């Protein structure tokens, strides 16, 4: 039985990737790697240091001098930036609306991809993001492309924000998600596209548990 496989999950904002990836990782006793949190951490630090988000060279220089650690905890994965817990800070509306701008820079992606590949080198990982199957883990044994309608993804984000105590408008969230889809799919550096060998999973009408079970079934087949 091949145990330490790599599972790559890609998809647009609000598709449920992180929530479902965490459940899959826990069920398989795998490590979960949230690549989106890494890009959010870079965005947050740049904003804190007043670095212009279009300044690729400065962003790359800042990132090269930074440490981003992902640590499991009973409350879920915690994100540490230069030793400080920024798990809540990186989920702000300001960071959410700016992260695609930072992620579009090839030098930033290059540095983070190297870190992500190192984390996944020994397998036994579930990694989610925008370009995992197409770029970061091209040889992953299981590749999933997860999506849902813009309306459903906005509804989920709205509920998440309410739980976190973040004020948001459902209509504005729909606009932001549609814009982020456009930015992510049209960027030059590793655009959001489905890998040829990825399995498409539409989560619009699926519960979180149903989607996780579908992936677990596929994972078990790959591990035989």
Swiss-Prot record:
GO terms for biological process: nucleobase-containing small molecule interconversion; pyrimidine nucleotide metabolic process. It is an enzyme of class 2 (transferase). Keywords: ATP-binding, Cytoplasm, Kinase, Nucleotide-binding, Transferase. Pfam families: Cytidylate_kin. SUPFAM superfamilies: P-loop containing nucleoside triphosphate hydrolases. ATP binds at residues 11-19. The keyword Isomerase does not apply. InterPro entries: Cytidylate_kin, Cytidylate_kinase_dom, P-loop_NTPase. It catalyses: CMP + ATP = CDP + ADP; dCMP + ATP = dCDP + ADP. It is found in: Cytoplasm. It comes from the Bacteria. GO terms for cellular component: cytosol. The keyword Transferase applies. One of its GO terms (molecular function) is ATP binding. Its EC number is 2.7.4.25. Belongs to the cytidylate kinase family. Type 1 subfamily. This is Cytidylate kinase. It comes from Lysinibacillus sphaericus (strain C3-41).
């Amino acid at each position: 039985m091949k145990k330490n496989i790599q599972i790559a999950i890609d998809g647009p904002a609000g598709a449920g990737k992180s929530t479902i990836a965490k459940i899959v990782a826990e069920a398989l006793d795998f490590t979960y790697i949230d690549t989106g949190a890494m890009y959010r951490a870079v965005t947050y630090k740049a904003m804190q240091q007043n670095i212009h988000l279009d300044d690729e060279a400065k962003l790359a220089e800042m990132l090269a001098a930074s440490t981003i650690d992902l640590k499991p905890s009973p409350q879920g994965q915690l994100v540490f930036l230069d030793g400080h817990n920024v798990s809540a800070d990186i989920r702000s509306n300001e960071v959410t609306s700016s992260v695609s701008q930072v992620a579009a820079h090839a030098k930033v992606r290059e540095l983070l991809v190297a870190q992500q590949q190192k984390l996944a080198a020994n397998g036994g990982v579930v990694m989610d993001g925008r370009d995992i199957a197409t770029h970061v883990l091209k040889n992953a044994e299981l590749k999933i492309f997860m999506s849902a309608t813009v309306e459903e993804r906005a509804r989920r984000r709205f509920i998440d924000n309410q739980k976190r105590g973040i004020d948001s408008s459902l209509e504005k969230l729909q606009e932001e998600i549609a814009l982020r889809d456009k930015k992510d799919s049209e960027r030059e550096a590793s655009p959001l596209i489905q890998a040829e060998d990825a399995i498409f999973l539409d989560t619009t009408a699926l519960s979180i548990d149903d989607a996780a079970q579908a992936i677990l079934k596929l994972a078990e087949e790959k591990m035989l």
